Swiss-Prot record:
Coiled coil feature spans: none
Entry keyword Transmembrane: yes
PROSITE patterns: IG_LIKE (PS50835)
Region entry C region, spans: 1-157
Protein's membrane topology: Single-pass membrane protein
TM region(s), chain numbering: 158-178
GO cellular component: external side of plasma membrane
Protein name per the record: T-cell receptor gamma chain C region 5/10-13
Length: 190
């Protein structure tokens, strides 16, 4: 049985809110994509870091992909709690060592202070980086991470648009087929 020698715990991918979203709406949405888990039963909830209260969040349906499952969960954070860290807690029977996964999301304000006019000062202030090569590596890593997030977000919306376009096309084709079938039935009666 291939399930005994494979890792079937949820694999998280996180998406942070865009600067445009936080500036325009004075709120931000954290998104957690959980992939490649089995079995289907999973529980996802959100908390402030080190908090006990479960926050109101949304989630999509659990979707089967080949022999495993995936699920989205998202939390919209209002302006008054944007400065706090948040955690996405994942309960699943195949979590490593049987411990709930806790996926940390940085404060929204802090996530954007690293992308400012003088990023060198920002990195030094928040991470105490003293070595110039460490600083450059850190900045390159952040740039790569931001590029990955932007690319993934664009890919997600592109596939979503293509999906809806396919649904409209399918509806049109089905309509034409039923119309043609109805016309041929009318011709046979006459």
């Amino acid at each position: 049985d291939k399930r005994t020698d494979s890792d079937f715990s949820p694999k998280p991918t996180i998406f942070l809110p865009s600067a445009a979203e936080t500036n325009l709406h004075k709120a931000g949405t954290y998104l957690c994509l959980l992939e490649k888990f089995f079995p289907k039963v999973i529980r996802v909830y959100w908390k402030e870091k080190d908090g006990e209260k479960i926050l109101e969040s949304q989630e999509g349906n659990t979707i089967k992909t080949n022999d495993r499952y995936m699920k989205f969960s998202w939390l919209t954070v209002t302006e008054d709690s944007m400065a706090k860290e948040h955690s996405c807690i994942v309960k699943h029977e195949n979590n490593k060592r049987g411990v709930d996964q806790e996926i940390l999301f940085p404060p929204i304000g802090k996530a954007f202070t690293t992308i400012n006019v003088n990023p060198r000062d920002s990195v030094l202030r928040h991470e105490n980086v003293n070595n110039a090569t460490d600083l450059e590596d850190c900045m390159k890593g952040r740039k790569d991470m931001l590029q990955l997030q932007v690319t993934t977000t664009y890919a997600f919306y592109t596939y979503l648009i293509l999906f809806f376009k396919s649904m409209v096309h399918l509806a049109f084709v089905v309509f034409c087929l039923f119309r043609r079938a109805a016309m041929s039935c009318d011709d046979q009666r006459s």
